[in-house]
C-alpha cells in the first residue's frame, strides 16, 4: 500500500562563490562591504593594503551561499598584489564615487585590467557585475548623474545601484539582487542571465548618448563638420531624432540627449544663411 505522505524535499546543495571588489581608491568599496556584513559605517578612511579577505553566509531562495569576498586595493601600487585574484570569480562589485568623475572614467580601465589578467581563455561574460554609484548622500558634490551611470552599466549588461555606505541606502537591495543573479548564473551552467534592461535599447543608441554628453559644441553634437550647410545639419538632426526620440528610445539619458540635439540644430541654423 502506497503512503500518502508527501516525499520530503531534498535541501538544495550549498554554494561557495567568490566575489571581488574593484574601483579606484577612496570610492567606498570597503565601506560598502562593511555596511552590509557588519551593519556599520567606518567614517575614518583607512586605505586597503593589498587585499582584505572575508567570508559571509547568506540565504538565497532556501539555498545557503558561502561568499568569499576579496576587497581589492584600488591604488595602482597594489597591482602586483591584486592581479592574482581575478581568476575563478563569479561576481564583481564595481564601485565609483558619484562626486569623482575620474573614478567613473576609470571603470573601463578596471574592466581592461581584469580582462588582461584573465587571459585569452578567461570569459567575462560568465561573471555577474554590479555597478555601485556610491556616496549618493553627498548630493552637493555629485557630478555623475544617475542616467549616465545607469547607461554605462546597463549597456554592458551589468546591474546598477545607487548606494550610500554612510546611510545604508541601496546596500541591502544591491547585495540581494547581486547574490540572486550569481545563483542564477550557477544554476544556468555558468552563463550570465541576460539583463532585461540592456535589451530594451541598442548599443548605437547608448554610444550616441555618450557622444552627445561629451560633445564640445553643436557641430560635434550633430556629428557634422564646422561650416556644414543647412541641408547637412537638417539631415544629421533627422537621423539623431529618429534614433533618440523619447517615444522610441528608453535608454537612460535619451530625453536629455534629444533636447540637446534639438537645441544644437536650432543654434546652428540661426547662423547659417
UniProtKB/Swiss-Prot annotation:
Keyword line: GTP-binding, Nucleotide-binding, Nucleus
InterPro entries: DnaJ_domain, J_dom_sf, P-loop_NTPase, Small_GTP-bd, Small_GTPase
Cross-referenced SUPFAM superfamilies: Chaperone J-domain, P-loop containing nucleoside triphosphate hydrolases
Required for interaction with MAPK1: annotated span: 1-18
Subcellular location(s) per record: Nucleus
Span of domain J: 217-273
A GO-annotated cellular component: nucleus
Superkingdom to which the source organism belongs: Eukaryota
Gene Ontology molecular functions: GTP binding; GTPase activity
GO biological process, one term: intracellular protein transport
Tagged with keyword Acetylation: no
Pfam families: DnaJ, Ras
Main location: nucleus
Annotated GTP binding sites: 23-30, 71-75, 134-137
Gene3D superfamilies registered for this protein in UniProt: DnaJ domain, P-loop containing nucleotide triphosphate hydrolases
The family this protein is said to belong to: Belongs to the small GTPase superfamily. Rab family.
Subunit details: Interacts directly with MAPK1 (wild-type and kinase-deficient forms). Interacts directly (in GTP-bound form) with MAP2K1 (wild-type and kinase-deficient forms).
Known function: GTPase which can activate the MEK/ERK pathway and induce cell transformation when overexpressed. May act as a nuclear scaffold for MAPK1, probably by association with MAPK1 nuclear export signal leading to enhanced ERK1/ERK2 signaling.
Protein name according to UniProt: DnaJ homolog subfamily C member 27
Gene of this entry: Dnajc27
